Amino acid sequence: MAHSTLSVVIPTHDTRELTLRCLGSLGHGGASPVDVVVVDDASSDGTAEAVRTDLPEVVVVETGRNVGFSRAVNLGVEQAAGDVILVLNSDTEVGEGALAALVAAFSDDETLGIAGAELMDPDGTPQWRAGRWPTGTWLFAQASGLGSILSRIPGRRIVGSGGAAVSGAVDWVSGAAMAVRREVWVNCGPLDESFRFYCQDLDLCYSARQAGWSVAVVPSFGVLHHHGATIANAPGASGAFHPAHLWTDLVRFAAKNQGPEKARCAAKALRAGARVRLAGRAMAGIFSSDRAAWMRDTAGYREGLTAVANVLKP
């Protein structure tokens, strides 16, 4: 089997130090990319200049204005030459031997179209990394915050430390560290730029699965992910995610790929979950030791509820 070549594309916005750490980690991956492309999405912290100074071999693309994750990735892939394109969040760090494991997976399995990483918190705790297509129950659990209680629901995300073998046993993998065979990118991509913040990964994986490709988490493709570091300070964020962006993009994914009835059901499940979360937060706020954080996060969830209520309106 021919040995696959690898390109790495890293979109970044105001994450200079994280981006440099991400780039530095590539040297431990066990396989040398044919090229590395950093797409600076209108950063104000000197990211592009720092990368050019510290790592002149890296290709730097500057968008000139904030165009969002999907557009930034698409611009980066235009500059990439590898048979396999690895899209990395700027808040990730590649583990020892991870790139070698990834390249081997694509070289050994011609049916593998998209591969995800064994994502981990800095302390080694497994993160959400892959799963089945979202169900109404899962959407309710996500919006309500009851996922840990309803951990055995259909459609749950896979978080086990072993991930999933390269067998096509998952429907989607996380875009935080997602590798795409070039043939899949050409025929099923690029990323849909109407998904500016979330669900680009689900959407591309859906197209790949429909075209007959397998999607899998690759064992030993370990990636540390500082989850939420790129969005935690954005207006409307609640901790490590942005409810309004995530929930509306989930509804848009359903509308695009599963039809209007599924989209309406998704919106109802998310609204119901959001109301449960807000009711719980109203009681928890009485005992909150960090009133400012409670108010910020609660405002984010309220914004999410309003956004979901309006997302399907003409």
What are these language model-derived features?
Residues 25, 40-49, 65:
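A conserved acidic beta->alpha catalytic loop
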Residues 25-33:
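Short, acidic, metal-binding catalytic loop of nucleotide-sugar glycosyltransferases
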Residues 62-80, 101:
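Glycine-rich, basic loop-to-helix element that forms the pyrophosphate-binding segment
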Residues 85:
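Short aromatic/hydrophobic "clamp" motif used to bind/position activated sugar donors
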Residues 93-130:
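Conserved donor NDP-sugar-binding/catalytic core segment of glycosyltransferases
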Residues 134-170:
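Short, flexible, basic/aromatic active-site loop/helix in glycosyltransferases
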Residues 163-166, 171-190, 194-222:
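A short, conserved alpha-helix in the catalytic core of glycosyltransferases
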Residues 210-289:
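Active-site-adjacent helix/loop segment of glycosyltransferases
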